Amino acid sequence: MSNCKVIALTNQKGGVGKTTTAVNLGVSLAQQGKKVLLVDADAQANLTMSLGYPRPDDLPISLATIMQDIIDDNPIDVQNGILHHGEGVDLLPSNIELSGLEVRLINAISRERVLKTCMSEVKKNYDYVLIDCMPSLEMLTINALAAADSVIIPTQPHYLSAKGLELLLRSVSKVRRQINPHLRIDGILMTMVMPRTNISKEVTALVKSVYGQNIKVFDAQIPHSIRAVEATAEGKSIFAYDKNGKVAAAYEQFGKEVADIGEKQRNKNRADRLR
């Protein structure tokens, strides 16, 4: 699918609901009739385990295997590594091998573009590719930003999380300047929100006032809920685990916002090609 959109979900701070967002955004887009590939770009393999693969180190092919073949200039067959989930999304899994690959990338030719080469092999089959990045700004995350069309930043309504946004935005700007000039920021998603608490309200208002002029802050806010954690432990999305709950409703709204951005961008690209 030539109109495939590659989105990196990234935040250098861990524990902001990034992997949960990747799973539920992917399933939400699939429920809208989109073909979706989830890519686990974190050696901790949380996304892989969240989709029902509790022993990722036993998987014969992972993202690390494929990226190593690209570094070694071997033939690659990404399709053989893709797993299919019952809720209509595909997964390119990760495991501990990815941590070793991070080191080997340092000496690789075109080291920032190895993941982009991998994505070029698969994106023709999908409407959306969602890359779940590790909570750092190291070489694998730079690879994800180099491969992506856009970035979504999940963040908690805590002061430290909001403070860390500035560092992340500087890194995105640097990648845009030096490697991927077409990289856009789709928006900031507030996660684990406790609407009744003052701090949630204050930090959300702060993020909107500081960044809202230039960057979209999604209308959807993901509420804090133990149900989301339980769903992950079961290898399911929130839609399969608690479809009538508040978290499912929030992720459904978020999925529609993301699809709307994608559709507007596709229409713009078509119009630009016709000029």
Task: Label each PLM-derived region with a short phrase.
Residues 1-275:
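P-loop NTP-binding core
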